[in-house]
A protein has these predicted regions:
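Sequence context surrounding c-type heme c attachment/ligation sites in exported
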Residues: 25-37, 56, 60-65
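The canonical Cys-X-X-Cys-His
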Residues: 35-42, 98
Length: 105
């Protein structure tokens, strides 16, 4: 591998890292603006009820799937009616950003 290829890979890796950091920052803002903190806590680790899950540090792929399932209606247990209403106003891109943020806590 020559120097040029090495530099290209480095630039791409840096871009991905910066993109994920920006996505996580956006996720923090979305977590607040979409009112997630009202039930899951400001730190996503102190829910307001004993049936509300802690979200901090959860696996990103798991979070994405659960949020998509709430949005589509595939998940219909517990607080699913409330979550379905909230998720109706959350885009696929926002789901990704919120999941990135929560998984990094």
């Amino acid at each position: 591998m020559n120097f040029k290829h090495c530099m290209i890979r480095t630039v791409i890796a840096c871009g991905i890292t910066i993109s994920l950091a920006a996505q996580a920052q956006d996720g923090a803002a979305l977590y607040a603006s979409k009112a997630c903190l009202a039930c899951h806590g400001a730190d996503a680790n102190t829910p307001t009820t004993n049936i509300t899950p802690k979200l901090a540090g959860q696996n990103k792929a798991y979070l994405i799937q659960q949020l998509k399932d709430f949005k589509s209606g595939a998940r219909n247990n517990g607080q699913s009616a409330q979550m379905a209403g909230i998720m109706g106003n959350v885009s696929e891109e926002e789901i990704e950003a919120i999941a990135e943020y929560l998984s990094g806590l």
